[in-house]
């Protein structure tokens, strides 16, 4: 071994990570690295880069959970190498999955299953759950049309202002999306416009129980009743799928009198995010069908499980089982009582913010975060004809300088001239944290007032509604 090799070896063994040779070069980003490096150095490089991400706890744009207790981290670590799709190899994880399906079905008032096991599945998130619910709708509709001897080449789906996953579903599965556009004073699907869009080629109607733009509920019951009348008048029977990405784990606990779920006979399936208000870590969603008849069997694949067969219906395959296991932990840990307390706390924060922000400017509130109105979100716009000397984009940009990610964006459809600001209140965004946001909000308003030349220059460049 020559002197240089000895020096290099000594460096690798003894040098501190910030004195190591491998940290004195820029990390590879375009080509696969040629050489190995010390694990502590590789970790340090990546760890330092992650500091440039936003602080997840201050992200008030996301609907997703940004706080998990230590036990969730432990369970995720224990499950990192358990493959969710391998039911035979990990039977207890599979059993936990089935228990969660039963619990969610019970929460949403699904009819008691004939064999004791509810019909549903875990997914990577509510978007995959929507895809599966949409596929089942299309297959059921196609079967009915074929039985009636009618063509099946022009399916359509009727919805209000939906999350982009429904646009993807329509494109991927060749379905015409008839989206009822937002318009001033009418920001979600109403029965009249819904019925005008329906015909015998409608595979289903999809209300969003927690509209992503504003946080308001698109209440399913009036739409359901209108479809009953439509069937009585035309003979056309149309199913419903409820996209309850956020509301599915809120209303059962804080607004149980809202009839939105399987209590409505036309509702054949419901999807929701476990990793939003289900309180699970990222990567967990659920879709539940009313019964076995609502899920066409040709979409189900059977895999080995405990010496027998179990049906699976999913788009994704290999992924860790930790998210499902963590969801089960939250169900056991909190129960109905605990979920009610956690969700009520978020609504209390939303109500407090709405009351305080209303005092600070000429705002018109679209959602004030009341349990009977929608999810715990505060959404507002500047009142028509008012010019406070700043835009909501300016305000969003100033708050970002303090780490707060509070989006300002335009609405969709025929309301693209309306700019709103939306604040999501979730577990971990407690009252004291909300008070700190208000202090920075007031400081931002003062800064904009003191620097009028800076007003109106910020653009919608920090948030894209998807």
Swiss-Prot record:
Record-linked Pfam families: Pyridoxal_deC
Record-level GO BP terms: glutamate catabolic process
Group of enzyme by EC: lyase
List of residues that carry N6-acetyllysine: 446, 453, 464
- Cofactor names: pyridoxal 5'-phosphate
Q: Where are the transmembrane segments?
A: none
Q: Which InterPro entries match?
A: Glutamate_decarboxylase, PyrdxlP-dep_de-COase, PyrdxlP-dep_Trfase, PyrdxlP-dep_Trfase_major, Pyridoxal-P_BS
Sequence positions that bind pyridoxal 5'-phosphate: 126-127, 212, 275
* EC number(s) on file: 4.1.1.15
Q: How does it assemble?
A: Homohexamer composed of three dimers.
What name is this protein filed under? Glutamate decarboxylase beta
Organism encoding this protein: Escherichia coli O6:H1 (strain CFT073 / ATCC 700928 / UPEC)
